[in-house]
Amino acid sequence: MYNPTVIDNNGKSERAYDIYSRLLKDRIIFVGTAIDETVANSIIAQLLYLEAEDPEKDIIMYINSPGGSVTDGMAIYDTMNYIKPDVQTVCVGQAASMGAFLLAAGAKGKRFALENSRIMIHQPLISGGLKGQATDISIHANELLKIKDRLAELLAKNTGKTKEQILRDTERDNYLSSEEAVNYGLIDSVFRR
């Protein structure tokens, strides 16, 4: 992946930053890939760093993600709710699956999407081809059902929908436009020029 470098010139000196470090300087975190352990650890570290820098100033998280690992996404979610600064969320492009979950987890009144963004919610998936004894598969299935239930509870809390409606609406992939995401309660408004 190409990682651009930007030059910051304050009139007295110049400093080169990779683009993500430059964004971080302005309290911006960019989630631009699928969420896995490495991505989650980086985002969590950035959230904690920005809280330590100024616990009163908002953090802005831009999301363009197809989703990813539930456990890694939940670690980000918990950190967003643990730190003192409000986390504004902005969808650019897509926020699908765990990306949509994190988009909805932003501070109330501070959750946005650009006009042509797409948001997709669905139930959690097992990936990687589950193998093993029937008992082990049953254990994994029960855990997946618990995760599905917990995600529905949290999404209901963040959207104002009932848990039952969330469970119905996430039974299959459910794609929403930015406006539909506002009406659903996933975001608060659409950014337009």
From Swiss-Prot:
GO terms for biological process: protein quality control for misfolded or incompletely synthesized proteins. GO terms for cellular component: cytoplasm; endopeptidase Clp complex. Disulfide bonds: none annotated. The keyword S-adenosyl-L-methionine does not apply. Its main location: cytoplasm. One of its GO terms (molecular function) is ATPase binding. The active site is at S97 (nucleophile), H122. It catalyses: Hydrolysis of proteins to small peptides in the presence of ATP and magnesium. alpha-casein is the usual test substrate. In the absence of ATP, only oligopeptides shorter than five residues are hydrolyzed (such as succinyl-Leu-Tyr-|-NHMec, and Leu-Tyr-Leu-|-Tyr-Trp, in which cleavage of the -Tyr-|-Leu- and -Tyr-|-Trp bonds also occurs). It holds the Pfam family CLP_protease. Gene3D superfamilies: 2-enoyl-CoA Hydratase, Chain A, domain 1. Belongs to the peptidase S14 family. This is ATP-dependent Clp protease proteolytic subunit. The lineage of its organism: Bacteria, Fusobacteriati, Fusobacteriota, Fusobacteriia, Fusobacteriales.
